[in-house]
């Protein structure tokens, strides 16, 4: 009798563990939520019904945890890791979706905007070739605006944006 109970228990445990791979984290079942602010951040959310990561625009504050900077990050967290290459690849997909060029985004000047929020952000400084902190006001910014230094560095990585020395070489050649 005890052997049968142990056998059935282990069988049920095995079934539960096998099905656990199909379980999506609860955050991934939340709907896309732009939040209550009016900034413009292209993001991805996991759509549990289609089992895909879809794009949406995040307003910069509020919202929920079903929000990712890249399709790859979204798929890794919610879709079982089948989302393709790293965050740089996801950044390129996001930019292409919005008809933006990564070099153009990373070349934009920092833009605080006219609103009075106090949101620490990072932008890529083309002159120094580094991601630097600035205070974003919460509205009317541009795409060179990242929540973390890591996101900025990933998006404006050396292979993605023109470096100051490349720009200088181009201008020097054009001057002659």
From Swiss-Prot:
- InterPro entries on file: Kunitz_BPTI (IPR002223), Kunitz_BPTI_sf (IPR036880), Prtase_inh_Kunz-CS (IPR020901), TFPI/VKTCI-like (IPR050098)
GO annotations of cellular component type:
extracellular space
Its keywords, alphabetically, are: Disulfide bond, Protease inhibitor, Repeat, Secreted, Serine protease inhibitor, Signal
Q: Where is this site: Reactive bond for trypsin?
A: 116-117
**Function noted in UniProt:** Serine protease inhibitor that inhibits trypsin at a molar ratio of 1:1.
Taking every annotated instance into account, which residue ranges of this chain make up the domain BPTI/Kunitz inhibitor? 28-78, 106-156
GO BP terms in the entry: envenomation resulting in negative regulation of voltage-gated potassium channel activity in another organism
Molecular functions per Gene Ontology: potassium channel regulator activity; serine-type endopeptidase inhibitor activity; toxin activity
Keyword Signal attributed:
yes
Tissue specificity here reads: Expressed by the venom gland.
Task: Show which residues form the site (Reactive bond for chymotrypsin).
Answer: 38-39
Q: Sorted alphabetically, which PROSITE patterns does this protein's record hold? A: BPTI_KUNITZ_1, BPTI_KUNITZ_2
> Which Pfam family, giving just one, matches this sequence?
Kunitz_BPTI
Quote the subcellular location field of this record: Secreted
The cysteines joined by S-S bonds are 28-78, 37-61, 53-74, 106-156, 115-139, 131-152
Q: Note the Gene3D superfamilies from the entry.
A: Pancreatic trypsin inhibitor Kunitz domain
Q: Which residues form the signal peptide?
A: 1-18
Name of this protein: Kunitz-type U19-barytoxin-Tl1a
Q: What else is known?
A: This protein was not detected in the venom by mass spectrometry.
Q: Which family does it belong to?
A: Belongs to the venom Kunitz-type family.
């Amino acid at each position: 009798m005890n052997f049968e109970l142990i056998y059935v228990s282990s069988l049920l445990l095995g079934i539960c563990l096998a099905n656990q791979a199909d379980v999506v984290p609860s955050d991934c079942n939340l709907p896309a939520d732009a939040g209550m602010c009016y900034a413009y951040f292209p993001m991805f959310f996991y759509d549990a019904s289609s089992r895909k990561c879809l794009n949406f625009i995040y307003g910069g504050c509020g919202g929920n945890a079903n929000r990712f900077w890249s399709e790859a990050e979204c798929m890794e967290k919610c879709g079982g890791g089948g989302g393709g290459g790293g965050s740089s690849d996801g950044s390129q997909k996001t930019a292409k979706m919005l008809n933006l060029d990564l070099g153009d985004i990373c070349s934009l000047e920092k833009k605080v905007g006219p609103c009075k929020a106090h949101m620490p952000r990072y932008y890529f400084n083309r002159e120094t070739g580094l991601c630097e902190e600035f205070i974003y006001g919460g509205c009317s910014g541009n795409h060179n605006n990242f929540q973390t230094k890591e996101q900025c560095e990933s998006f404006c990585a050396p292979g993605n944006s023109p470096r100051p020395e490349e720009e200088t070489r181009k201008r020097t050649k054009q001057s002659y």
